């Protein structure tokens, strides 16, 4: 068999040989700078050049420095500050440096603008406001001359906020007018400077409203004053009232667009110009109307005078708010409300002034009802003498008194005992004459304190009492009783079968009221509800002081009010109360039920005893449990199913472990054990001992 040729086979081209191209070491090659790259570099430098002083830019050749005599040759469109090329305006006489001079503060001193051929030298302060795009604070007497002299400047798109530029065909270039022509601008309409180009067409024409001749100051002096004035940050435009007062002070008369004196110069159609917004400033909110009764004293005064409205000087009537309800409130309710809300010290408003829903006034911080305009007298309004009698007769509820105290500026006079503040809870309802015939006659009764010492359901009783006092339930459930902490006069019918009572009882007692007494409303309170402050509501809810006071007063009142009754009537009433109480007590949940529902807490001793019992049961169970060894023996647990866990102390595993080394005592014990094993290993039965090698004869 011939041996294989020893020459190795020719090397084939590797499958991945092309990868070498990608993994070559990197070589830096110098790139030729392209024209587009150079152009973008110039644009970027021009953008950055906004932050550099002018001489440096001229040195680097980024700005063409046109000499001042070279007025006649305007360059083509100069580049704007943000590097874009400008839209061509044929008639705008500007040089390329002119804009730079506009947008940057002039570092090399003042030079006159190339677009102007005015003989007067313009002071630096006059040019500066235009260059900084700041709105110089023009005092009311100083007309803004320089704003109108300057020709319209194109503003870069970055500075003009969201304003849409108008098409070029609309823009009429403003020819520079000599300063002698410029009429002083009226102080109300001094516009803050924005670029004239982006103003609405109606505003491009300068405002040329003339003042009386006494006001016109010589123009040279004005420009000098303007130059002296320091640059200030722009102030917010004053609100309408202040501007009105200024006008009346300056001109001796109020300038309205309708009543302005005509002058020789043509006046554009009268219009109100909102002061245009400076490009750097955020938009100023429109001035607020001044008669929002922001002065509470003014509001109080106008309330007291009831009709002679005193509003601040520059106030306009405020827009009417939508009425609170779709249906107008009843006139009786309105009169009641007026009666309740009027401070006691003020004279009562005559009946002809008590109007139906008054025109809503603007929201005031302290809700003071605006004085109502006089209206022809209403037929439904009761005569004032009756109203006054009514007021003096019924005690004023406490929450209404608080309302009055909050509303009136003067301290309220102290009332006599009949007018003492009283909670609505204890006001009795009179039954109308129509109902008296149909319904059973009710008897007021003083109930002594019927409170079980271990009573847990006060809430039920309180809710029961509420239902007895609310007007609708007094008709539907005539059998309600008040049982609670406060003894008071309660309405109980003189004779009614108890079965009817019990049916009623089942209908409406709710256990959910845990808030204390919920007070009912009178009919005229519905309208009053919106007006009441939170403090009054709080007092209305929890008027405990009034409850106590009425509780004290009740016994004396009851002596006078209650007629003498026969023994049978008293027994009947007591029987009714007794049946009600029995029924209530029979319905009470037992202590066990309450404990189950976690309402009643158990006694501490009982709780501990229960704990002990549980512990004892558990230990007994544990003691009877089989051990692990037993379970393993009985093959219930396999050896790997139970792992004993012991507590091991943490120790350093690399350190010396002395417990692993055997002490001499350990060794002796081990040896002894081994010897014992050996000695017993060969133990044999006596009968077979002779078979062994080691035996004594």
Swiss-Prot record:
It is found in: Cytoplasm; Cell projection, Lamellipodium. One of its GO terms (cellular component) is lamellipodium. It comes from the Eukaryota. Its main location: cytoplasm. Residues 63-381, 450-569 are annotated as: Disordered. RPEL repeats lie at residues 42-67, 579-604, 616-641. Residues 189-202 have a biased composition (Basic and acidic residues). One of its GO terms (molecular function) is actin binding. GO terms for biological process: actin cytoskeleton organization; closure of optic fissure; enteric nervous system development; negative regulation of integrin-mediated signaling pathway; neural crest cell migration; neural tube closure; positive regulation of catalytic activity; regulation of cell cycle. Transmembrane segments: none annotated. Residues 454-469, 501-514, 522-532 have a biased composition (Acidic residues). Residues 317-326, 370-380 have a biased composition (Pro residues). Keywords: Actin-binding, Cell projection, Cytoplasm, Developmental protein, Neurogenesis, Repeat. Regulator of protein phosphatase 1 (PP1) required for neural tube and optic fissure closure, and enteric neural crest cell (ENCCs) migration during development. Acts as an activator of PP1. During neural tube closure, localizes to the ventral neural tube and activates PP1, leading to down-regulate cell proliferation within cranial neural tissue and the neural retina. Also acts as a regulator of migration of enteric neural crest cells (ENCCs) by activating PP1, leading to repression of the integrin signaling through the rho/rock pathway. PANTHER family: PHOSPHATASE AND ACTIN REGULATOR 4, PHOSPHATASE AND ACTIN REGULATOR PHACTR. Belongs to the phosphatase and actin regulator family. This is Phosphatase and actin regulator 4-B. The lineage of its organism: Eukaryota, Metazoa, Chordata, Craniata, Vertebrata.
